[in-house]
Amino acid sequence: MQISIFAVGRMKVGAEQELVHRYLDRFSKSAGAVGLHFRKMQEVSESRAQTACQRMEEEGKRLFEALPEPSRLIVCDERGKSVSSIAFAEKLAFYRDEGVRDLVIALGGPDGHSEQVRDRADFLLSFGLMTWPHQIARILLTEQLYRTVTIANNHPYHRF
């Protein structure tokens, strides 16, 4: 299963970007053994529209244009479900075993996602009740992708 990340906003060069790349590199090196592959990180600029609703709609349109068809969509959203690392790994394994070819995980901009994006989501994922800066949300997501592979491979990185 090909996994892509769609992110509104661009990472600045620095420690956060290095950490995201490190986790994606670790993921890519060991994910093939469990039928997962990292396809791409697609970054789009934040909308400059005047209202939050307009910005979310514009960013949502960019997401829909980028979605391969057919694909599954996980949307990172504060209204989503907070799950354990094992439950997240099981969700990805379920999609893979179901024969899903493309999975896109979407990180929204400062305003979040539009209602249309949330409605299209196959799963709404929350990183908990706290608000996270965009760079840290990317780190959390990429670390969990790597952790998913370590869980599937029974690697000691994830302590059971």
UniProtKB/Swiss-Prot annotation:
It comes from Bartonella bacilliformis (strain ATCC 35685 / KC583 / Herrer 020/F12,63). Keywords: Cytoplasm, Methyltransferase, rRNA processing, S-adenosyl-L-methionine, Transferase. HAMAP family: 23SrRNA_methyltr_H (MF_00658). It catalyses: pseudouridine(1915) in 23S rRNA + S-adenosyl-L-methionine = N(3)-methylpseudouridine(1915) in 23S rRNA + S-adenosyl-L-homocysteine + H(+). It holds the Pfam family SPOUT_MTase. S-adenosyl-L-methionine binds at residues 108, 127-132. It comes from the Bacteria. It is found in: Cytoplasm. Specifically methylates the pseudouridine at position 1915 (m3Psi1915) in 23S rRNA. Belongs to the RNA methyltransferase RlmH family. Its EC number is 2.1.1.177. It is an enzyme of class 2 (transferase). GO terms for molecular function: rRNA (pseudouridine-N3-)-methyltransferase activity. The keyword Transferase applies. The gene is rlmH. GO terms for cellular component: cytoplasm. This is Ribosomal RNA large subunit methyltransferase H. Homodimer. CDD domains: RlmH-like. PANTHER family: METHYLTRANSFERASE (PTHR33603), RIBOSOMAL RNA LARGE SUBUNIT METHYLTRANSFERASE H (PTHR33603:SF1).
